[in-house]
Amino acid sequence: MIPFSHCIRNLLRRPGQSCQLIAGSCVVVLLVMTAASMNHAMKQTLGNTGDPLNTIIVGAGSEESVERSEVKQGVAEIIGSSISGIRQIMDKPSLSPEIHFNGMLSTQDGKSSQALIRGVQHVALWVHQRVRILEGRFPNPGEIMVGRLAHKKLGFNRSQLQIGQILVFNGEELIISGIFDAIGTVLEAEVWVPLQDLMTYTQRENLSCVVVTLDEARSFGDLDAFTKRRLDLELVAIQETEYYTKLSTFYKPIRWMAWICAFLLSIGALFGGLNALYASFSSRIQEFGAIQAIGFNRWKILFSLIVESSITGLIGSLLAFGIVVLILQGITVPFSIGVFVLNFTQIILALGAGTGLVLGVIGGLPPAWNCLRPSLPETLRAA
């Protein structure tokens, strides 16, 4: 077997080509890990948002979009008096009538952005139990409460969404009264407004939905039967987890586009690496002949060349690891209904290492085999 140190020396003898191969491997591994992290983060964020005990009551025909839904006022009271399996807190049912509205928010300096605004009452904190008020308090009339990551979704500076700052919505100036979080969900990129205020600002008479928290998941059947029995109310019951699962399916093409872009760019980098390896190995044909002449067969030389290219792939992977850990880890990425946070898990890092190794093997095999095909006399006579 050719010594491992021989492979290292060959890489150091051609630092320019080695750096080119390492950079190409780094780019490919970085793209693959970023695509994997985006897919995982978006899917996990949407999955975390749904509570298995929560049911969303929406208008018939609006099961896939709460924003388009219309539910008559008073439905929450009707449901509370008709269904026995609703969780009670302080002798009150956990029912949250809500309006979900996509609208433009502006800062005082005129910067505007589209926000997902949720009109709620205090009971929303009972229903959405992941929500915690970090600073300040729940908004009173004329006030607004923002999620911890709302500034990322809106593209505003963090300082513009601090307590006491003013945001403008539909010509109304709203004072920020509190900041909340809901770790790992899309909720913490939302903006919450008192329900009655939002109905006034948007001139709406109906709700978007009613979110109900049940004592146990099997009580959903009673709630579903109620909506099917009361045809006059034109309601549909959908479990919150199922709603966000459908949203995740809706965003699946976007996640696939990330993979496709990573794949296409990786193919380009792979061909660039193949060209570099062909040039590098072709200039060493005489060296390969000399190694065969002293007793090493072609398979051992082939293995040594694959080890060389694999080393460049693994070094590129290590560089990519450094970039994701120091720069990309924890970055927030906005999308239409919120933000998700990139998280490079151990599985994703292992995928990156495997990609670098496979890239080295696949990239090194064709040029290595092509250079070892000539007979020993031909390689020794090669210029």
How does the language model describe each region?
Residues 15-42, 252-287, 310-319, 362:
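Hydrophobic alpha-helical transmembrane segments of multi-pass inner-membrane transport and secretion
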